Amino acid sequence: MDENIKKAEYYYKKGVEVGNKGDVEKALEYFNKAIELNPFYRDAWFNKALALRILGRYEEARECFFRGLAVEKHLTHKKYNSDDEK
């Protein structure tokens, strides 16, 4: 597994952990770091959107939600095409 992907997973999990404890600002920092390391981390995009919504930053939350959907579509398309090649 790529080192950046491992690091992104670490930061994502930390974001979930601190977010569950109520520190939404810190969770947002962790989700941003995870996305910086792996821009295709769908769950990080969705959780970033949730954190932004909680913070009342609705337009940014909407944008992140749609980024997450775009990543999901990309990954599904990529998987579908790789399955066809088998």
UniProtKB/Swiss-Prot annotation:
UniProt keyword Repeat present: yes
InterPro entries with a match to the protein in the record: TPR-like_helical_dom_sf (IPR011990), TPR_rpt (IPR019734), Ycf3/AcsC/BcsC/TPR_MFPF (IPR051685)
TPR repeats: 8-41, 42-75
Keywords noted in UniProt: Repeat, TPR repeat
Protein's UniProt name: Uncharacterized protein MJ0572
Protein source organism: Methanocaldococcus jannaschii (strain ATCC 43067 / DSM 2661 / JAL-1 / JCM 10045 / NBRC 100440)
Phylogenetic lineage: Archaea, Methanobacteriati, Methanobacteriota, Methanomada group, Methanococci
